[in-house]
Amino acid sequence: MTANTLKRKISLRIKRKRKIRANISGSAVCPRISIFKSNRTIYAQAIDDTNSKTLCASSGTALKIKANKDGAAILAKDFAEKLKAAKISEAIFDRNGYLYHGVVAAFADALRKNGIKL
């Protein structure tokens, strides 16, 4: 993959991200769950946009998991436990410009299985 192709893919993802963020917003009762994936790991955080605060976060580096579907399911289980400890049962899912496919879809499905309403 050439450098220009990579820059174009990243800029298109950022463009999709901005369009998504224009329409969704989280609150303390129903936070926005944002996911970020790199080649090595996955990160997730619950964000209260009205107060600009991160309510809770979970990372794949702390759990020593890879950025694949199995790792996404493990991360979602850990993240759901943190959300339940913070008394959050409902949230808005922000796919952060990524396609709702693969790791992102596996993370969202695992959150739903662990009792978080998206």
Swiss-Prot record:
Keyword vocabulary terms for this entry: Ribonucleoprotein, Ribosomal protein, RNA-binding, rRNA-binding
GO cellular component: a single term: cytosolic large ribosomal subunit
One annotated GO biological process: translation
Listed SUPFAM superfamilies: Translational machinery components
Descriptive protein name: Large ribosomal subunit protein uL18
Name of encoding gene: rplR
Subunit structure: Part of the 50S ribosomal subunit; part of the 5S rRNA/L5/L18/L25 subcomplex. Contacts the 5S and 23S rRNAs.
GO molecular function, one term: structural constituent of ribosome
